[in-house]
């Protein structure tokens, strides 16, 4: 296979990996956790994965503690947990 063909194949595989939704089997278990604001009193806008709606929603994080279902962006949440 030529180098151009290999490059095309690599590009297609990368695109497929980005567009393939994450199944429940592949989703990290922390995506199933309810959002936790933590024990501090900050008011940071964060995103969590909502298992029931399969969406990445906003919550407010206190700044410390909490759990791993806590993302800075919706894109990060979607890439990790597969939400909409």
From Swiss-Prot:
InterPro entries to which the protein is assigned, alphabetical: Kunitz_BPTI, Kunitz_BPTI_sf, Prtase_inh_Kunz-CS, TFPI/VKTCI-like
UniProt key word Secreted: yes
Site residues by UniProt (Reactive bond for trypsin): 41-42
Pfam families for the chain: Kunitz_BPTI
SMART domains: KU
Domain BPTI/Kunitz inhibitor, residue spans: 31-81
Paired cysteines (S-S): 31-81, 40-64, 56-77
Keyword Secreted: yes
Tissues expressing the protein: Expressed by the venom gland.
Entry's localization field: Secreted
Predominant cellular place of this UniProt entry's protein: secreted
One term under GO cellular component: extracellular space
Keyword set, alphabetical order: Disulfide bond, Protease inhibitor, Secreted, Serine protease inhibitor, Signal
GO molecular function: serine-type endopeptidase inhibitor activity
Signal peptide residues on this chain, from the entry's feature table: 1-24
Family that this chain belongs to: Belongs to the venom Kunitz-type family.
Summary of the function given for this chain in its UniProt record: Serine protease inhibitor that inhibits trypsin.
Name this protein carries in UniProt: Kunitz-type serine protease inhibitor B2
């Amino acid at each position: 296979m030529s180098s151009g063909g290999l490059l095309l194949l690599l590009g297609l595989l990368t695109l497929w990996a980005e567009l393939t939704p994450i199944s429940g089997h592949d989703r990290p278990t922390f995506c199933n956790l309810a959002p936790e604001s933590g024990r501090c009193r900050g008011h940071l806008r964060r995103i969590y994965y909502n298992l029931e709606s399969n969406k990445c929603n906003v919550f407010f994080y206190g700044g410390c503690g909490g759990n791993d279902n806590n993302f800075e962006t919706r894109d990060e949440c979607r890439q990790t947990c597969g939400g909409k």
